[in-house]
Structure formats: structure tokens, C-alpha cells
Amino acid sequence: MAKAIFITATGTDIGKTYVSGLIAKHMKDKGLNIGYYKAALSGSLDITDSDAWYVKQQADLLDSYDEMVSYTYKHAYSPHLAAQIEGNPPDIKVIKNAYENINKKHDYMIVEGSGGIICPIRYDNNQKIFLEDIIKELNIPSLIIADAGLGTINSAVLTIEYMRSKNLKVNGVILNRFEMANEMHDDNKKMIEEMTGVKIIGIVIDGILKLDEKNIETLFE
């Protein structure tokens, strides 16, 4: 089985897919066999305009789109609502089986979530699935993507503490849109670490991922 990490974020449009692509490319460039999987994806009229396709192109991944994504919805809503409207609800068994199949082909796996950590994937009378259920079913640790700017202390600490309350392992945080010599960004980094005990294992500056190389291996454990 591949070593895997679940990538979530402090909210929508924080840069989760963007950073997933940077991590995948970073590892691919190092000669590591990296794969990508996303259980449910919404707001995609065409696969070439999807999160998974972006990561696939960024890191030159060879897996097919169907291997990388189990459920794709056209409506740009939370997956649970898009699934209700389009009549194709996710099933946790299908998700686990699809993940295990692509997992076998790689040494490392990135599993990307949808939106923030409290995101309903399915919510109906038959089954209720949240991101935390997928993480537990796949039994993998998580990485949180957060914005470097104003308000991130609150959103990052709340995300970490919520995940801890659900007994989910958090292996680190990456700050996106970080600016050097920005005292607020520097302080945000320090405060998140001090308030939670979770390390900021990387930052993204002008589209460049700054990642401590010694963290890349432990990130997936």
C-alpha cells in the first residue's frame, strides 16, 4: 500500500488544489511514484476544467481521470447538494474501492478533499457522509492548507481543533500566498504553531512551494 496524505483546507478557494499540484509535481520531479485521488468533485462542466485534471497536468500524472475521481458533478455546490440535484449520490464503499485500486499503482498518494473539513459529501435519508468519514475509512493522516493572510489564525486553529475532536491525525499545515518580510504572515505562522503544536511544514511564495525536504517523507506517515 502507498503512503498517503489527505489534503484539506481551512475553507473554499484557499488553494487546496493548487498546492496539491505543487506537491505532486515536487515529488514527481524527485523521481517518486506519486498518485492523486479525489472522491467527489463539483462545479465541473468538463473534465479538463476540473481540480483533478489540473493536478494531472501539473505533475504529468499518467492515471486516467476516471481512476482519479469517483464522482463528478456539474453544479458548483457542496457535493451533497450537487449529488441530490443530479441524482448520483456518493457511496463510501465505491470511494474506498476506487482509492484502493489507484493506491496499488503508486508509492505515495495525495487524496484531496472538497472545500473545508466540515463538508458534507452525501446527506440524505439513506446515508450521510462527511469528509471525516472518508479520512477514517481510508485511515490516512491529513495536511491542512491555509491562507497566510488576515484571519488565518482563527480558521487554522478551528480546523485543527475540530479535526482533533474527531480523532483525525494532522501532520502539518502549509501556508499559501505567503509573502516574505510580511510581519503579519510571519506572526500568523508563529501563532498557529504555538497555539496548536502543529508545524507549518511549508509555505507557497509567488507560486513556488518552499518545503523542508526532511518533512516530505514524514508528511505521509
From Swiss-Prot:
Catalytic residues identified in the record: K38
InterPro entries assigned: DTB_synth_BioD, P-loop_NTPase
Cofactors that this protein relies on: Mg(2+)
GO biological process, one term: biotin biosynthetic process
Positions bound to substrate: S42
Enzyme class: ligase
Cellular component annotations (GO), alphabetically ordered: cytosol
Binding positions for ATP per the UniProt entry: D13, I14, G15, K16, T17, Y18, D51, E112, G113, S114, G115, N176, R177
Tagged with keyword Metal-binding: yes
Keyword terms, alphabetized: ATP-binding, Biotin biosynthesis, Cytoplasm, Ligase, Magnesium, Metal-binding, Nucleotide-binding
UniProt family annotation: Belongs to the dethiobiotin synthetase family.
Free-text function comment from the UniProt entry: Catalyzes a mechanistically unusual reaction, the ATP-dependent insertion of CO2 between the N7 and N8 nitrogen atoms of 7,8-diaminopelargonic acid (DAPA, also called 7,8-diammoniononanoate) to form a ureido ring.
Subunit structure: Homodimer.
Protein name, per record: ATP-dependent dethiobiotin synthetase BioD
Gene: bioD
